[in-house]
């Protein structure tokens, strides 16, 4: 099995460079003469790669950007979104666990509304409506906390009523 030598493999890469390597002129070494790797890198400098840049969280943080034109047709108008061009790459919390807990264990009518808004958060994020997702997330959290508060009040009222009933009964 014949394997090509290293020089034969490098030859197509070094054809366009005008660099003389130290192996070609062993006695002569000029200050600043580039090595083969540097010459290859310099030959690629003029080429432009057509692939788009990969998205990154930190890409372009210091570079000014024109403001993004967002769809302002969201039905959630009470959002406190500031309209900045740098959007958070993180999904707003949907508070689904709180909504399920408040629906099953606390005050179910408000818990159902919190559950619906928690689902709306994920749908708005999937559509790219970050403003609507944030507003739905805040509403789901507030309704979940309200349902837990109303549930605690309901349970406390039930315990007080039960204690009053048992205290008013005559012992057997």
Curated annotation (Swiss-Prot):
The topology of this chain with respect to the membrane is: Multi-pass membrane protein
Q: Which superkingdom? A: Eukaryota
Q: Does the keyword Phosphoprotein apply?
A: no
Q: From the UniProt record, give one GO term of the biological process aspect.
A: hematopoietic progenitor cell differentiation
One GO CC annotation, please?
intracellular membrane-bounded organelle
Q: Does the keyword Transmembrane apply?
A: yes
Q: Which residues cross the membrane?
A: 98-118, 140-160
Name the keywords, alphabetized: Membrane, Transmembrane, Transmembrane helix
Q: Which residues lie on this side of the membrane: Extracellular?
A: 1-97, 161-172
The residue ranges flagged as biased composition, category Acidic residues, are 69-81
Q: What is this protein called?
A: Transmembrane protein 91
Provide the membrane-side ranges marked Cytoplasmic in the record. 119-139
Task: Report the Pfam families cross-referenced here.
Answer: CD225
Intracellular or extracellular location(s): Membrane
User: What InterPro entries has UniProt attached to this entry?
Assistant: CD225/Dispanin_fam
Chain residue ranges for the region called Disordered:
1-31, 55-83
Its predominant location is membrane
Q: Can you name the source organism? A: Homo sapiens (Human)
UniProt similarity note: Belongs to the CD225/Dispanin family.
């Amino acid at each position: 099995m014949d394997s090509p030598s290293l020089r034969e493999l490098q030859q197509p890469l070094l054809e366009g460079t005008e660099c003389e390597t130290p192996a070609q002129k062993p006695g002569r070494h000029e200050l600043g003469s580039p090595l083969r790797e540097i010459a290859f890198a310099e030959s690629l400098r003029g080429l432009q790669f057509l692939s788009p840049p990969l998205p990154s969280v930190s890409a372009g943080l210091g570079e000014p950007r024109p403001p993004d034109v967002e769809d302002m047709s969201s039905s959630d108008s009470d959002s406190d979104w500031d309209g900045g061009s740098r959007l958070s790459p993180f999904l707003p919390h949907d508070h689904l666990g709180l909504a399920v807990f408040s629906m099953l264990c606390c005050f179910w009518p408000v818990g159902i509304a919190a559950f619906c808004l928690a689902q709306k958060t994920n749908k708005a994020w999937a559509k790219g409506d970050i403003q609507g997702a944030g507003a739905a997330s805040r509403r789901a959290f507030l309704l979940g906390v309200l349902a837990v508060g109303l549930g605690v009040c309901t349970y406390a009222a039930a315990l007080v009523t039960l204690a009053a009933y048992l205290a008013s009964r005559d012992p057997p």
